[in-house]
Structure formats: C-alpha cells, structure tokens
Amino acid sequence: MSDSDIPDPAQEADSRSPVSSGSGGIPATLRALKHRNFQLFFGGQLISLIGTWMQNVAQSWLVYRLTGSALKLGAVGFAGQIPVFLFAPVGGIVADRFNRKQVVIGTQIASMVLALILALLTLTRIDVWQIFVLAALLGIVNAFDIPGRQSFLVEMVGKEDLMNAIALNSSMFNGARIIGPAVAGVLVAKIGEGWCFFANGISYVAVIAGLFMMRVPPRTYRPPVGSPVTHMVEAIRWVWKTGPIRALLLLLGLVSLVAMPYTVLMPLFADKVLHGGGQALATFLKARDLGAVRLGVLMGATGVGALLGALTLASRTGVRGLGRWVAYSCGGFGVSLILFAASRNFWLSTLLLLPVGFCMMLQMSSSNTLIQAMVPDEMRGRVMAVYSMMFMGMAPFGALMGGALADRLEAPLTITMGALAAVAGAIWFGSQLPKIRVEARRLIVAQAAAGGEPSEEITARVVEE
C-alpha cells in the first residue's frame, strides 16, 4: 500500500464512519451508504455499469447482425468469459497480496481502453474476429477485477455493513441493468452500436475518479509464506472441505452452466421467436431496427426483476434464513425460465422476465453474502476468485453449449432443458440444508467473533428462525 493510501486518524474515522452526525437517520436498507468510501464507489460504479450494460447489449446485437448465428453468439460469450475461469485464481492471489484499491483502479482503466478501441473499430470497419479478441482481453481484465472488487467491499464499509454493501452493490448493478439495455436498444436502432461502446468507455471516468478520491484505511496483512500456487491450492482445498461453501458454489456453478445461457440467446428471441409486440414502441422512438428495441426491453425487464431482488436482500439485517432463500430462488429461477421459453408473445415474455431476474439475483446475492460471512479475511480474495470461477467461469461453457444446441434444437428448447436442471439443483440443495445450516452457523459465528461482535448480536443474526 502506498503512503497516499494511509490516512491520518481523522481521515480514517471519516471514511469508515457516518458522513455526518445525522447519518443515523439513514434507513437500514441503505446503511452502507453512511460510509464515504462506499458513497464514492456507488455513484461512480452506477454510471460505469450503465455503460457496461449498454456495451453488453450492443455487442450481442452486433455479433448477431454480422453473423446471424446462435453458435457465434455463444462463441463470443465463451471468449469473453473463459479467461475468468482460467485466470480468476491469479486475480484472487493478487487481491490478497496487493493493494485492492490499486488493483481495481488498474482494471477499470484497462476496461475503459478496451471499450474505446471497440468503439473506434465499430465506427470504422470491424470484423467478427476483432470482437472475439477484445472480448477475450476484457475477460482477462475481469478475472482480476471481480475478486479485487468483491474483496475490496469490506475495506469500504467494514464487516458490520458488508451484507448491506453486497446487496446495494447488486441493486446498483441491476439498476444499471434496467437503464443500460433500454438506452442501448434505442441507440443501436437509431445510430448504431459504435456509439454505445464509446459511451461505455467514457463512463469509466466516473468510477475511476471515485476510486482516486477514496481514503482507505490500511488493512491488517500478514506477509505470505510460500508460493502463490500453494496459496491458491490452499484456498481451493479449504473451499472443498467447507461443506456450506462447497454446496453454494456447486449450485451456483450448475446454474451458470445450464441456465444463464438464456442471456446469450436473447437476440434470437428478440428477432425470431417472439412476435406481437414492440412495433408501436419502435415507431414512437423512430427506431429503424425493431429487433434491437425488443432486445433492449427484454434485457431491461430482467434488470427490473433483479433490482427488486437485490433491494429485497438489502432490507435484511442478518444472514438468518438465507440458505432457504438460495434454494427457493434457484427453483423459482428455473420455473420462470420454463414459462418464458414457452411464451411466443413479446409482452408476456417481458413480464415473465421479471421473476427470472428477481430469482436469479436473490440466489446470486444470497450466496455471495453467505460465503463472505463465512470466509476468513486473509483468504477472502482467493475464495472470491473461486466464486468468480463458478459464477462467471462456468458461464462460457454454458454459452458455447447453449449456442450450439440452439442452432440444432432451437432456443426455447435449449433454455427449457437448462431450466429443468436448475430446478433439480434447487431440490438437491434444499435436501442438504439441515446439514449445511449447522456448519454454516459455526463458521459465521467464528468470523463475526473474530471481528469483535458481541456474542448476543451474533446469535441474533445467525440462529435460524
């Protein structure tokens, strides 16, 4: 950590405590926002994520417009996410060994540069292979960004508000998921994909500026003994022998592999599968490309549901009962996807994506919260790297498999098959809950006690109803 990141006592108190004496009036749902550092992160990241979602939608539509192939859509998804599976362990080691704030600044600058290059190529003349290369490079950046950013949250708010910070972070992500796709759908239909990529590049300025303005207190850090490979193997072994975390990550990996590819196939639904809606909206917006408008609406609907799910989690003050939430939300995600795949009406499908997004976000955020509550701080970056491998690292295999199956079996049947597997996973996880709950309670109490929480408060937050 550099000297510029070590605040004096007054600065440290200001950055990790309420921003004013009146901050006690902040609603419990927003309590992490009493921390100045999290305020800076939240505001900048919200702007940046709107740009990110604009790029995600525009890139999918660009690939589909250039190729018309579900397999190529899946292949670009594979190229963009497989680096997370391969390099997230390295990213986790970096997050545990180096200044996490500086790591996140570096990844945000790299992402900005890649977005601007994609914009320049698209506004001139772009080939599909260039999209593949840039997607893969962004995936490498994400392999360092995700564990760094996830483990940096605790330094912004402390362990006492970590659960709320995770939930608000998810709320921010999905608030952007509503705005970004809607804006992208209109921009793509009116002026093309390149300007969406350019807007994303500029949006990174907000989060980078916020990170530079933070005053982060130094974290307690024990110098590592042994090689980085040894440390990563140690973390993987710890995850595997820790039953609750192993079960959460296996379920998360299953869903990412078989059910999450629905997002990759969304351009096909917008253009070929769904009918009977969107024409009036496209006419009102004076948009030439009805498919792009539909895609923006569908992705935005998922974001609305996911935002509601994240806000539901943010309203909680403890981890009690989250295991049940994981099981129920995973099952609900699968059932909602089955209904979506069966629909052929655009507006009905848009409505069905609300519970899809809601349940998806509840499972992801509840799993993240439970894992972070159980993991020791000195292993947080590496364990979150394993989380990234299961959450984002399995997705590329699912995207490639989903694209190939959709070319052979059609997109609706592909999604239905994956959704049925997600329901089966939810049933399995629910059957393991009694055993999971006992060990999870022990781990959460141990970590909370290590953070200095009174035993009666820990019991109130952890013991199942």
Q: Can you describe what each PLM-predicted range is?
A:
Residues S2-E465:
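Alpha-helical transmembrane-bundle signature of multi-pass membrane transport and export proteins
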